[in-house]
Amino acid sequence: MADLLPEHPEFLWNNPEPKKSYDVVIVGGGGHGLATAYYLAKNHGITNVAVLEKGWLAGGNMARNTTIIRSNYLWDESAGIYEKSLKLWEELPEELEYDFLFSQRGVLNLAHTLGDVRESIRRVEANKFNGVDAEWLTPEQVKEVCPIINTGDNIRYPVMGATYQPRAGIAKHDHVAWAFARKANEMGVDIIQNCEVTGFLKDGEKVTGVKTTRGTILAGKVALAGAGHSSVLAELAGFELPIQSHPLQALVSELFEPVHPTVVMSNHIHVYVSQAHKGELVMGAGIDSYNGYGQRGAFHVIEEQMAAAVELFPIFARAHVLRTWGGIVDTTMDASPIISKTPIQNLYVNCGWGTGGFKGTPGAGYTLAHTIAHDEPHKLNAPFALERFETGHLIDEHGAAAVAH
């Protein structure tokens, strides 16, 4: 009977019982955890791996992000890992043998003040220096790329230009998770859902396994990829992470015919908008200012987001909001991720991505897998070590996202 059914996500991977031990246990079954498992198997031949997810596969931030993919970051370190990630995105549909609707429709980052203009042009030149495709567009050119933007001078924050990355775009987030899960499963990785980590087994300052709601699992190495709950996991392991967790809201509209050809982001007024493949408008804004782990936020953030969006896109004035939701973003003091070894031997961490987690999915998995396999960081994630908060070698990317950190 199963052979007669159409392909469905629940049939793309097995749901085994946990084994007593694994070479590597990855905590967190979202995009980063699944990508790490895939690259451990593909690049390093390590297949005795378990991915533990406390709920359903990719049901956390992977299911709640706004799917934007880009690499136009200012600093060399950020450009390096995000550009590597974008190049991996371009290869993955064929490599994973799964169409996750990767659409390179370009991303516009709007400038509304002279300060924005200067900073944007600086970022374009830095991108070019790092081999990242980037252009500076005048308001007239912005209108050509996205005709529905209001580029008039009669709005609060007139559009004075924009940076443009043509290779950037969006992808279907749940399909991305399914693609990684299926391929990792084919290589021998165990994907274990409804298995929450409640503690760690240690021999002195060395991790030897995890305690879970489905029993104790021994492990040669353990990697934390739990996004917003990373600080909770680190505390269970006996060390602290310099991150804070905030709610981040997003929303979608009802379905429309294709009207929005690209992705538009505005750091100044904190709104970003794209149109999904089915036709709904997908919007995000700034984080809620309070700390918390609730996957919901305050209504005033949505109100301010709507006001900004309607001013930039008058055509949206009569659109109806279909639903809103929230995710949990883990932010560092320099708005850059942590992909690193930890004070606990054989315990590794990937966290602090803030609002950039989805776009960094392949790059995070690629570099974390290397770090686990060799017990040394890849050159791309070496700058994102935990020790940078002691040495002061920070990578300040607060201006890189269209949200308030």
From Swiss-Prot:
Main location class: cytoplasm
GO biological process, one term: tetrahydrofolate metabolic process
Record-level GO cellular component terms: cytoplasm
Catalysis performed (reactions): sarcosine + (6S)-5,6,7,8-tetrahydrofolate + O2 = (6R)-5,10-methylene-5,6,7,8-tetrahydrofolate + glycine + H2O2; sarcosine + O2 + H2O = formaldehyde + glycine + H2O2
Keyword Flavoprotein found: yes
Cofactor note as given: Binds 1 FAD per subunit. Binds 1 FMN covalently. The covalent flavin was originally thought to be FAD.
Residues of the signal peptide: none
Gene Ontology terms, MF aspect: nucleotide binding; sarcosine oxidase activity
Activity regulation description: Inhibited by Zn(2+), Cu(2+), Cd(2+), Hg(2+), Ag(+), p-chloromercuribenzoate (p-CMB), iodoacetamide, N-ethylmaleimide, CN(-), o-phenanthroline and sodium lauryl sulfate. Iodoacetamide (IAM) acts by modifying the beta subunit on two lysine residues, one at the FAD- and sarcosine-binding site (Lys-359) and the other at the covalent FMN-binding site (Lys-172). Inhibited competitively by methylthioacetate (MTA) and pyrrole 2-carboxylate (PCA), which bind to the beta subunit.
Effect of substituting H270A: 10-fold decrease in catalytic efficiency
Gene3D superfamilies named among the record's database cross-references: D-Amino Acid Oxidase, subunit A, domain 2 (3.30.9.10), FAD/NAD(P)-binding domain (3.50.50.60)
Cofactors demanded by this protein: FAD; FMN
Annotated residues for binding of FAD: G31, H32, E53, N61, M62, T66, I68, V197, G354, G357, K359
Compartment(s) of residence: Cytoplasm
EC number(s) given by UniProt: 1.5.3.24
pH dependence: Optimum pH is 7.7 in potassium phosphate buffer and 8.0-8.5 in glycylglycine buffer.
Subunit structure, as described in the record: Heterotetramer composed of subunits alpha (SoxA), beta (SoxB), gamma (SoxG) and delta (SoxD).
Task performed by this protein: In the presence of tetrahydrofolate, catalyzes the oxidative demethylation of sarcosine to yield glycine, 5,10-methylenetetrahydrofolate and hydrogen peroxide. In the absence of tetrahydrofolate, catalyzes the oxidative demethylation of sarcosine to yield glycine, formaldehyde and hydrogen peroxide. Can also use N-methyl-L-alanine and N-ethyl-L-glycine. Is very specific for oxygen as an acceptor.
Listed name of the protein: Sarcosine oxidase subunit beta
